[in-house]
Structure formats: C-alpha cells, structure tokens
Amino acid sequence: VLIIAVLFLTACQLTTAETSSRGKQKHRALRSTDKNSRMSKRCTPPGGYCYHPDPCCSQVCNFPRKHCL
C-alpha cells in the first residue's frame, strides 16, 4: 500500500511539473514576440507623410506630394 501511495504522489508531481513548465514556455514566447515587435521597423500608413527612416507600409510613396499611397 505504501509503494502505491509513493507512486501516485510521484505521478502527481510529474504531471504538475509538466503543466507549469508549459505555462512558462508560453510566457517566454509571448515575451519574445513583444520584444520583436518593439525592435521591428515602423512604417507610415497610407496618406501619411513619407520620408526615409519610416518608409510607407505599402512601399509606395508619392514623392511630389510626399505622402504614402
């Protein structure tokens, strides 16, 4: 009976450890995505002023009027 109780408690601990490690992995992935979004370059939406550091999101700039298409 004691052996069965020890095996049951060990199985419960392993299951709990797997569940909590999955939660941490998901959290790390979210943190990584947030970091990547901050590091990505900005782009100017259509109708906005186009200039070199922040190119147009559409990749098309009307240079005479200097706005993104």
From Swiss-Prot:
GO cellular component: extracellular region
Superkingdom to which the source organism belongs: Eukaryota
Database matches in Pfam families: Conotoxin (PF02950)
Propeptide residues per the UniProt entry: 18-40
Keyword Secreted: yes
Protein name stated in the entry: Conotoxin AbVIF
Tissue: Expressed by the venom duct.
Gene source species: Conus abbreviatus (Abbreviated cone)
Cystine bridges: C43-C57, C50-C61, C56-C68
Keywords: Cleavage on pair of basic residues, Disulfide bond, Knottin, Secreted, Signal, Toxin
The family this protein is said to belong to: Belongs to the conotoxin O1 superfamily.
Keyword Signal part of the UniProt annotation: yes
Domain notes per entry: The presence of a 'disulfide through disulfide knot' structurally defines this protein as a knottin.
GO molecular function annotation: ion channel inhibitor activity; toxin activity
